């Protein structure tokens, strides 16, 4: 009988729409790495802006609460993983208080970014969500880049990389977390 890992290390892959988060984390999951679980923030469902405003007081508040819920779920470790990889659009400032409060000892936050023209092409093309290619998304991407720079978070530019290449680079981040297991014990 396999015993569950107490609390997994968590790799947060954040970024704006079209940066390649979902595709890369899906590809990472396809590698079926031992002890690694891949999770998608939006799989919980994303309510309309109106519902976010009515029930949470706005999108920012919804994002903060859902980030906390995700971290609580991952810490509970229902899938018995050693490393949980969560991709989504959230602020590092929402991640850090929850990981401290919940006692997450091993985590990394990685920004997946790309040039605006590439993001726009991805959203209009394969994603078929051209409505997300706008000034607001560009501002969100710039905000996340600024936060990553200010907090000295690693940034992975997916502009000229294939999904498989980005997944390989994410695997390297998983290996870094796996290697830190002995240091945290």
Language model feature labels by segment:
Residues 88, 104-125:
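Conserved phosphate-donor/acceptor-positioning beta-strand/loop module used by diverse small-molecule
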Residues 129-169:
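Small-molecule kinase domains that catalyze NTP-dependent phosphoryl transfer to phosphate-bearing small molecules
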Residues 25-72:
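Conserved substrate/cofactor phosphate-moiety recognition/catalytic segment
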Residues 13:
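Hydrophobic anchor at the beta1->P-loop junction of P-loop NTPases
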Residues 62-106:
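Glycine-rich phosphate-binding loop used to anchor ATP phosphates in small-molecule kinases
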Residues 17:
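The conserved Walker
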């Amino acid at each position: 009988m396999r015993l569950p890992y107490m609390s997994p290390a968590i790799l947060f892959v954040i970024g704006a729409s079209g940066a390649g988060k979902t595709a890369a984390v899906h590809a990472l999951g396809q590698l079926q790495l031992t002890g690694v679980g891949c999770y998608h923030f939006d799989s919980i469902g994303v309510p309309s802006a109106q519902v976010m405003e009515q029930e949470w007081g706005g999108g920012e508040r919804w994002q903060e609460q859902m980030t906390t819920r995700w971290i609580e779920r991952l810490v509970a470790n229902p899938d018995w993983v050693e490393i949980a990889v969560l991709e989504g659009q959230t602020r590092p400032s929402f991640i850090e208080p929850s990981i401290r409060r919940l006692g997450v000892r091993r985590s990394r936050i990685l920004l997946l970014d790309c040039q605006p023209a590439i993001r726009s092409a991805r959203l209009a093309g394969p994603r078929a969500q051209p409505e997300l290619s706008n000034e607001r998304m560009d501002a969100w991407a710039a905000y996340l880049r600024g936060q990553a720079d200010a907090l000295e978070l690693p940034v992975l530019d997916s502009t000229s990389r294939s999904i498989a290449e980005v997944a390989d680079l994410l695997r390297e981040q998983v290996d870094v977390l796996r290697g830190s297991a002995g240091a945290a014990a």
